[in-house]
């Protein structure tokens, strides 16, 4: 609902302290609400650099607040290089996206989302299909990003959620069954019974 894909039956949707019920999905993107979907948005025939550049051109606005250490951004290309460096993708810039490992494709999707200048980042199952090593790297990357902007994370990997979240809401069959801190969710019998049938 926060992205505008679904409309609420009642109540108010707030985005960065502003009511956005009346705004379209595109309008919310321009307000800085950027989504990364479980289904890849990468164009496989394009290089890593080209995919990120395309995302920059889609947004057509560069937010310096993403990378505070840089004083100025002279062009779209230089912004792409900043993102490549930030996400440790510089050595892969000329690689065709279809040849990347699953973990590197997830990083590229994240880079493309960041290239659109988000003020809030919505991530849908970013850990899907990752092995333990890839998940660990992505967790550390997202920890650094959450220092810059809020992240809304939809994820079934509870260990990743516990490593990243400040507040968790757990859904079961479309209903919120528990909400609170990591510690509260770990101890919740409702969550344990719904998902694992035992301790988290």
Task: Please tell me what each predicted stretch does.
Residues 1-200:
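Glycine-rich phosphate-binding loops of nucleotide-dependent enzymes
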């Amino acid at each position: 609902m926060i992205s505008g894909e679904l409309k609420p039956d009642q109540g108010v949707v707030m985005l960065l302290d502003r009511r956005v019920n009346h705004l379209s999905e595109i309008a919310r993107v321009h307000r800085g609400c950027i989504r990364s979907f479980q289904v890849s948005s990468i164009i496989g025939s394009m290089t890593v650099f080209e995919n990120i550049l395309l995302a920059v051109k889609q947004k057509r606005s560069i937010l310096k607040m993403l990378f505070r250490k840089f004083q100025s951004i002279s062009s779209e290309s230089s912004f792409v290089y900043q993102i490549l460096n930030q996400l440790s993708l510089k050595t892969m810039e000329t690689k065709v996206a279809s040849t990347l490992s699953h973990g590197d494709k997830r990083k590229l999707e994240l880079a493309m989302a960041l290239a659109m200048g988000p003020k809030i980042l919505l991530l849908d199952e970013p850990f899907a299909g990752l092995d333990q090593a890839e998940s660990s790297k992505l967790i550390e990357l997202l920890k650094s990003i959450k220092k810059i902007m809020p992240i809304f994370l939809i994820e079934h990997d509870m260990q990743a959620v516990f490593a990243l979240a400040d507040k968790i809401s757990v859904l079961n069959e479309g209903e919120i069954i528990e909400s609170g801190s990591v510690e509260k969710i770990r101890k919740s019998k409702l969550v344990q019974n719904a998902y694992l049938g035992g301790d988290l």
